[in-house]
């Protein structure tokens, strides 16, 4: 990571990889000011990386797996032990408050599907490969690096998201401080019990 000092780095602004880059640079004794960020969506980031208009590209799977396999890109640092990466399913506050049982059923179904993917990632890769436009081996590589344990948002996840929000506020990506706890829906105990 120290070799990125003074280099152009493509990334999706305000994303999970933006936070990963900030933390990875800090770990190497650098800051975001030590590089030139080039804010691009994934497809444009790949094109810039492939054409060498940028020196590095910070991206998530399956784009990362595709770059590793198709472009022979080398991973400089992943988020292991550095950042918590979570993916979220969203509902409006009104829907969540009116239909917690439906959300509990959805969470239960997602858990079952996730267990199937973890049991047989190759089969899952064969199914999703044509949908994402990548070969099954690349989809399998990406799936193999992900966890599929869907759950309701825990206090630990709220804390991790608060750290990200605070960092983004410090970087002026978010105009004012916000409280993640205030915007996260907490299901009633009955919905949590139903999803177990």
Task: Spell out what each predicted region is.
Residues 1-66, 122, 158-163:
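Bilobed "Venus flytrap"/periplasmic-binding protein-like clamshell domains
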Residues 6, 69, 185:
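Phosphate-coordinating loops and pocket residues in cytosolic domains that bind phosphorylated ligands
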Residues 13, 34, 58, 77, ...:
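A generic structural-conservation signal
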Residues 14, 42, 80-81, 185-188:
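Residues that form or immediately flank small-molecule/cofactor binding pockets and catalytic motifs
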Residues 37-38, 43-130:
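Pocket-lining segment of extracytoplasmic ligand-binding domains
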């Amino acid at each position: 990571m120290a070799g990125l000092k003074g280099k152009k780095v493509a990334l999706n602004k305000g994303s999970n990889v933006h936070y990963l880059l900030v933390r990875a640079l800090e770990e190497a004794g650098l800051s975001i000011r030590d590089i030139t960020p080039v804010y691009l969506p994934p497809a444009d980031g790949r094109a810039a990386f492939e054409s060498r208009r940028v020196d590095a590209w910070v991206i998530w799977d399956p784009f990362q797996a595709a770059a590793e396999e198709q472009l022979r890109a080398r991973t400089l640092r992943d988020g292991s032990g550095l950042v918590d990466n979570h993916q979220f399913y969203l509902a409006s506050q009104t829907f969540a408050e009116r239909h917690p049982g439906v959300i509990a059923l959805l969470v239960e179904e997602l858990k079952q599907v996730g267990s199937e993917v973890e049991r047989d990632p190759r089969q899952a890769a064969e199914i999703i490969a044509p949908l994402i436009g990548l070969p099954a081996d690349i989809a399998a590589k990406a799936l193999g690096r992900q966890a599929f344990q869907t759950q309701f948002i825990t206090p630990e996840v709220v804390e991790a998201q608060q750290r990200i929000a605070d960092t983004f506020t410090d970087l002026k990506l978010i105009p004012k401080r916000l409280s993640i706890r205030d915007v996260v829906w907490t299901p009633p105990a009955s919905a949590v019990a139903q999803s177990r």
